[in-house]
Amino acid sequence: MTPLLTLILVVLMGLPLAQALDCHVCAYNGDNCFNPMRCPAMVAYCMTTRTYYTPTRMKVSKSCVPRCFETVYDGYSKHASTTSCCQYDLCNGTGLATPATLALAPILLATLWGLL
């Protein structure tokens, strides 16, 4: 073998192999769900979608996806939904903010502003 080919082979053997992403994959009628799984190699994102049927009733879905389209609200359907994506192992383990929590944010900011 030529020295250049030998050098290329040595360098390639030292490179780490691409690691598959680990995501929580589940569907749950309630606040949150956890089920860690190894995703296929082509997957680039962990996704969490929450569909709100009423302010207190929701469905949480978590999955592995090759592409992500984050949404805050789908105005065309009769149910509100939020979708978020992330790109590191088990990053979709935490839940998204619920509507009640989001409603408290302006009140908290106004209170803090009044204290300043």
Curated annotation (Swiss-Prot):
GO function term, MF aspect, one: acetylcholine receptor binding
Protein's UniProt keywords contain Cell cycle: no
Residue ranges of the propeptide: 92-116
Cysteines engaged in disulfide bonds, as pairs: C23-C46, C26-C33, C39-C64, C68-C85, C86-C91
Lineage start: Eukaryota, Metazoa, Chordata, Craniata, Vertebrata
Keywords attached to this entry: Cell membrane, Cell projection, Disulfide bond, Endoplasmic reticulum, Glycoprotein, GPI-anchor, Lipoprotein, Membrane, Signal
Lipidation (GPI-anchor amidated cysteine): C91
Gene Ontology cellular component list: dendrite; endoplasmic reticulum; plasma membrane; side of membrane; synapse
Primary localization class, coarse: membrane
Signal sequence, start to end: 1-20
Topology in the lipid bilayer: Lipid-anchor; GPI-anchor
Protein purpose: Acts in different tissues through interaction to nicotinic acetylcholine receptors (nAChRs). The proposed role as modulator of nAChR activity seems to be dependent on the nAChR subtype and stoichiometry, and to involve an effect on nAChR trafficking and its cell surface expression, and on single channel properties of the nAChR inserted in the plasma membrane. Modulates functional properties of nicotinic acetylcholine receptors (nAChRs) to prevent excessive excitation, and hence neurodegeneration.
Intracellular or extracellular location(s): Cell membrane; Cell projection, Dendrite; Endoplasmic reticulum
Gene3D superfamilies: CD59
Entries under InterPro entries matching the protein: Ly-6/neurotoxin-like_GPI-ap, LY6_UPA_recep-like, Snake_toxin-like_sf, Toxin/TOLIP
Domain UPAR/Ly6: 21-107
Organism: Homo sapiens
Binding partners and assembly: Interacts with nAChRs containing alpha-4:beta-2 (CHRNA4:CHRNB2) and alpha-7 (CHRNA7) subunits. Interacts with CHRNA4 probably in the endoplasmic reticulum prior to nAChR pentameric assembly. Interacts with KCNA2/Potassium voltage-gated channel subfamily A member 2.
Note: Isoform 1 is considered to be an endogenous 'prototoxin', that shares a N-terminal three-finger structure with snake alpha-neurotoxins.
GO annotation, biological process: acetylcholine receptor signaling pathway; regulation of neurotransmitter receptor activity; synaptic transmission, cholinergic
Stored SUPFAM superfamilies: Snake toxin-like (SSF57302)
Name this polypeptide is given: Ly-6/neurotoxin-like protein 1
